[in-house]
Amino acid sequence: HSCLVGSEMCIRDRYDIANMGLNSAEYIHIFTEAKKLAYEDRAKYYADMKFTNVPVKELISKEYALERNKLINLKKAGSVYDSGIFENGDTIYLTVADKDGNMVSLIQSNYRGMGSGMVPPNLGFMLQDRGEMFSLDPNHRNSLQGGKRPFHTIIPAFITKDGKPFISFGLMGGAMQPQGHAQIVVNIIDFKLNLQEAGDAPRFRHFGSSEPTGEIMLDGGFLSLESRINDQIRNELLKLGHNLKGVNDEKGVYGGYQAIMLKDGVYYGASESRKDGHASGY
């Protein structure tokens, strides 16, 4: 628990606390928001260090605290915060191309929580656990059965033009993948955005559809819009009968996109701001 004191004290490195005044509204607001951030880390990471790796050094570092404190809105109390950057591994996507016009679109995921936790002896990689995506209804087409491949969400995307490689791209994010891929393609083809703009543009995501695992959609599910989509559009969607619900933008719910395009003999690369990564040439 003592780590929390250090985390909350780091607000002094970003704000002029002394000039705010003892127990002023501004001081109490900032302190409370810093507490919310620190306690999200507490909820996720704090446990017996004999049994789990707790990133104490990182959690109490000034650099980490300053980065977290950037999330504080000085004009409004936060209703939802997430824990910090020390996430478990998840889906990765990369694409590469060579001087001859060959492209590779690669996406890899062991599924939930870095897979099954089972490592084949002497092989050094962990087995996936996508068997979770089977339906337990024996009459379902996607029912659990030995030797059968389960439903999965992995999509390494590729677009050809006149039979030749044009765009190699991918968008991580579980069930967001087909929605995100379609939005990216529409952004490029119909809205004429360039490769980077197509990924950086605000996205939307529908939740709650029926699933291959047997779940059934109820009440039409709900629609979530990124915060950059304005209130006028939100109000129009409400009038159309959509259920709107906010979700935490920081968890990758809107996907993570990277791409390479070959146009007129020139390669273009893109890596969006929602995720780690970059585009580079050689």
Each language-model region and where it sits:
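Single conserved hydrophobic/aromatic residue that forms the stacking wall/gate
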Residues: 1-6, 11
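Short glycine-rich loop/turn motifs
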Residues: 7, 89-94, 103, 122, ...
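Internal maturation/activation junctions in enzymes
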Residues: 15-110, 122-123, 130
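Short Pro/Gly-enriched beta-strand edge/turn motifs at strand-loop
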Residues: 73-82, 135-144, 240-244
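Extended C-terminal subregions enriched in glycine
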Residues: 100, 148, 181, 190-251
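Active-site rim segments in enzyme catalytic domains, especially the processed small/beta chain
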Residues: 102-167, 177-178, 183, 187, ...
